[in-house]
Amino acid sequence: MTLAFIRPRIGKVWEHDADVTMLQRSSTHIVKSDSLMEEVLGPLYSEEAVAGGLTHEKADLLFASIPYKVLPDFQRPAFEAIKQRDAAFYQKLEDAGFMLDFGDDESGLFLKYLRRGSGYYIDVGACDLVANGDIKLRSGVGIERINPHSITLTDGSELDADLIVYATGYGSMNGWAARLISQEVADKVGKCWGLGSDTTKDPGPWEGELRNMWKPTQQEALWFHGGNLHQSRHYSHYLALQLKARMEGLDTP
């Protein structure tokens, strides 16, 4: 069986003897899970951090205390260390034709996450299958047309396929709001997430905080909450306080 995929979640299918080809339409930031833990997260979130007296509440506060404007300067050294640590891994991926990046300004995963919420992948093993050639790769192309037993790609070539699996990542919160409520409300609220960094998929102007997250929006009584575990724990307190103040009739912005 031949399968065509549009992103890296492919290892489990390959293990069952499928002939897998992944289509990579644009460059992706890749970081190994263990490298991310040791070089970036470990000092804040690990058994060693807890043993040293750093609870997750303190770690959340420390992480949230860094202004987004200077966060790239904090992140670049860590991701430069990851580049050096996993240089052979990245070279094998590039040799296989995989398009890699570390963000517009080389600041790595977390800035991509905050700015656009896409374009990154935390690797737990599937990338080795791509690097080794066990999973075939076609990069820089998309699907032009789906045929009964094949795919015509945007470069004019044809790929035989019995099954196509779309694994194209995250959609926008604004798009979700349009589907859940209405396009009119989504347009009224405006873009959710992103900092206004004027980087790829995060147009300016600079906001200084995540757009429309955990604060009043242009639509009365509509609030947005999301993010990773740190953000969910930390900012849920501030969201809850704002809601409670309104329920109690307290004067609040």
Residue ranges and their predicted role:
Residues 29-71:
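A catalytic-pocket lid/entrance helix-loop region that shapes and gates access to the active site
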Residues 1-11, 15-26, 33, 69-253:
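Flavin (primarily FAD) cofactor-binding/catalytic cores of flavoenzymes
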